[in-house]
């Protein structure tokens, strides 16, 4: 808490300094008021002014505000840029910076000079500029054009009432002179004063048909001379509709997915409106929001790029078609229009078929490969595992071994549900039927009932007990081959006493072997021997 008063005092002390920072614009750097620029070069004038709030700047030349209409002048945040300076650009330039607290002005004096040779010195402030030059001490240089890129366009077409500027910026030593001629005739002083505004540029304004011709600039000094010729064509304005010149647009063929273009060249007294249309094929009218009728046919209006003016007075426009499809094929129209009417010309575009059209198998394969790889691997593996488990279970079921010995009755132990009473003998026929059905006989119950008198009464309880014990497994627990070794005769249950009983149970088997007694049952607690 003891630091709070000190912190408050510190903040209060900073407030006056922060308020003091806000104020009128001030100079951030030194400037050189006198600036010298070479003729035809680019010059930059800085305005290093700062302030809080940031000031707004405005440039003036000889008291006239410089604005966007000055084509060679550009006002930048850091200063003023003048391109291709001319002799008339010399003067006093002022940068005025203003904010809510005041204003500040930065003054420049711009001097434009021709190129001078290295051997010639500019006279100093105290030097003398008079006297004759010593030719022996001078290095002469013949004239040369310093801006050849500005002179590439030698054929110029302009309509009546427009203007044009012809440039021949040159340098040399001694300083060259320039003379303008029209159709090899020197322009008189009166004609030159009407047109020429600047030393190296001939400006022709408010052109008339008689201004058409060849204009030549001749630049010379003691070391030599050079010249350049411009052809000016002044087009007489006529009240007529535009005319499509040349052969374009022409029929075109393009590959599927390729790029092509149509071009349209229109001659008009004034800048025309050039528009591209595409004929709507029959049955596809619903694909387009709006259509227009031209000559009784429906067309859709296509996006159109810039219209370029050509030196011969015509106008050019191109329609670009990229990644061509079958829908792009058809008839296209170039329409040129002005206030007096319109003209149009048509051409056809043919799109070759796709050499590799996509097919349904490719789509299905791509969709299948889009499944996660665990699913692709897991489904077949699971199917194989389930199939193997089922096959293994079937094999184990067919090859299941006989019941273990623990299932046999123990001596002195009577299985539950068994009884020695004759009331239990009533189930014997049904059990015998089950035994004989395993051996293929359906008539065994009748034989058992018929031979019931020969078998002792004590046989049924014991036989019933033994059969009941072993039928729940549906397999034979103790078997003996009735047909001897190597016989294919089915095995016989040991619970029968002799062949008579066997034949009574299963008469259809037919072969029982040479032995008369294949087993016996002793009444010793249910043990089988």
Swiss-Prot record:
Domain (Ig-like C2-type) spans: 25-111, 143-233, 242-350
Q: Which organism is it from?
A: Mus musculus
Binding partners and assembly: Interacts with FGF2 with a low affinity.
Is Membrane a UniProt keyword of this protein? yes
Q: What is this protein called?
A: Fibroblast growth factor receptor-like 1
* Subcellular localization(s) per the UniProt record: Cell membrane
Tissue expression from the record:
Highly expressed in the kidney, brain and lung. Weakly expressed in the muscle, thymus, lymph node, stomach, intestine, colon and liver. Expressed in fetal cartilaginous structures like the nasal cartilage, the ribs and the sternum as well as in the cartilaginous rudiments of developing bones such as the vertebrae and the pelvic bone. High expression is found in the muscles of the tongue and the diaphragm.
Question: From the Swiss-Prot or TrEMBL record, what is one GO molecular function term?
Answer: non-tyrosine kinase fibroblast growth factor receptor activity
Query: Which residues does the entry place in the Cytoplasmic compartment?
Result: 396-529
Q: What functional role does this protein have?
A: Has a negative effect on cell proliferation.
A single GO cellular-component term on record: transport vesicle
Task: Spell out the PANTHER family in the cross-references.
Answer: FIBROBLAST GROWTH FACTOR RECEPTOR, FIBROBLAST GROWTH FACTOR RECEPTOR-LIKE 1
Keyword annotations from UniProtKB, A to Z: Cell membrane, Disulfide bond, Glycoprotein, Immunoglobulin domain, Membrane, Receptor, Repeat, Signal, Transmembrane, Transmembrane helix
Instruction: Give glycosylation sites per the record.
Output: 107, 227, 251, 289
Transmembrane stretches, by residue range?
Answer: 375-395
| Keyword Transmembrane found | yes
């Amino acid at each position: 808490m003891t630091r709070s008063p000190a912190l408050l005092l510190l903040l209060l002390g900073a407030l006056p300094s922060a308020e003091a920072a806000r104020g009128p614009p001030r100079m951030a750097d030194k400037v050189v008021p006198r600036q010298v620029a070479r003729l035809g070069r680019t010059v930059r004038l800085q305005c290093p002014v700062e302030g809080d709030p940031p000031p707004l700047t405005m440039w003036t030349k000889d008291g006239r505000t410089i604005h966007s209409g000055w084509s060679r002048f550009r006002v930048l945040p850091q200063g003023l840029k003048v391109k291709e300076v001319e002799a008339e650009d010399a003067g006093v330039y002022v940068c005025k910076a203003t904010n809510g607290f005041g204003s500040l002005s930065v003054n420049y004096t711009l001097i434009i000079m021709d190129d001078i040779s290295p051997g010639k010195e500019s006279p100093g402030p105290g030097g003398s500029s008079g006297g004759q030059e010593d030719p022996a001490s001078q290095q002469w240089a013949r004239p040369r054009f310093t801006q050849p890129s500005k002179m590439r366009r030698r054929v110029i077409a302009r309509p009546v009432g427009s203007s044009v500027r012809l440039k021949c910026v040159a340098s040399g030593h001694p300083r060259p002179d320039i003379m303008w001629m029209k159709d090899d005739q020197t322009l008189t002083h009166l004609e030159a004063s009407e047109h020429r505004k600047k030393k190296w540029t001939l400006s022709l304004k408010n052109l008339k048909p008689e201004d058409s011709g060849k204009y030549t600039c001749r630049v010379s000094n003691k070391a030599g001379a050079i010249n350049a010729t411009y052809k000016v064509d002044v087009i007489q304005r006529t009240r007529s509709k535009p005319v499509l010149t040349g052969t374009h647009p022409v029929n075109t063929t393009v590959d599927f997915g390729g790029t092509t273009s149509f071009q349209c060249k229109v001659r008009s007294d004034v800048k025309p409106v050039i528009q591209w249309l595409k004929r709507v094929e029959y049955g596809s009218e619903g694909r387009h929001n709006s259509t227009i009728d031209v000559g009784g046919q429906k067309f859709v209006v296509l996006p159109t790029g810039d219209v370029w003016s050509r030196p011969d007075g015509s106008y050019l426009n191109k329609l670009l078609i990229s990644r061509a499809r079958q829908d792009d094929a058809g008839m296209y129209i170039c329409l040129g229009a002005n206030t007096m009417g319109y003209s149009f010309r048509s051409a056809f575009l043919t799109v070759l078929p796709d050499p590799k059209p996509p097919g349904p198998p490719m789509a299905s394969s791509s969709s299948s490969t889009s499944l996660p790889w665990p699913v692709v691997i897991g489904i077949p593996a699971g199917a194989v595992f389930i199939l193997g488990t089922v096959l293994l279970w079937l094999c184990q079921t067919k090859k299941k071994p006989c019941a273990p010995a623990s299932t046999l009755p123990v001596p002195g132990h009577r299985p539950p549900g068994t009884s020695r009473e004759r009331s239990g003998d009533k189930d014997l026929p049904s059990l015998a039927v089950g035994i004989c059905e395993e051996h293929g006989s359906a008539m065994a119950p009748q034989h058992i009932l018929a031979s019931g008198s020969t078998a002792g009464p004590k046989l049924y309880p014991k036989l019933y007990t033994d059969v009941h014990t072993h039928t729940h497994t549906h397999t034979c627990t103790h078997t003996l081959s009735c047909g001897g070794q190597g016989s294919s005769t089915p095995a016989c249950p040991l619970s029968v006493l002799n062949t008579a009983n066997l034949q009574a149970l299963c008469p259809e088997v037919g072969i029982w072997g040479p032995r008369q007694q294949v087993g016996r049952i002793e009444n010793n607690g249910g043990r089988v021997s």
